[in-house]
């Protein structure tokens, strides 16, 4: 296998599981044998969690998650974990605000990703905005998420 280089700060508490003996592909990562780690009905009104995006933050892990509600409509939820295996999912959807501090909630939001650039975290997701579009928000503290204008419109 080729050498893999990480371009990030060390994360000493990242959970790790050795490659399963029966795994015969050359990918640099493999699925955790206990997947899924978040079961059904993880928070009030949320039937399932999909497509999470997790970052280390202040000695623990924080993630943004597609929380599919019991009515089938997905929204973005925040979760925290000490070990990146056992998660506490907030019961409230992330309450996005615009740059003036006004509530600005996506109607239908799914498949979030989370990335840190310098001192700011950016959440990016797919959403319905008069058709399929990309949503984006920024946060310094992973508590307040400020929506940025949609970078790509339908």
What are these regions (language model features)?
Residues 1-107, 115-154:
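Beta-rich carbohydrate-recognition and catalytic domains
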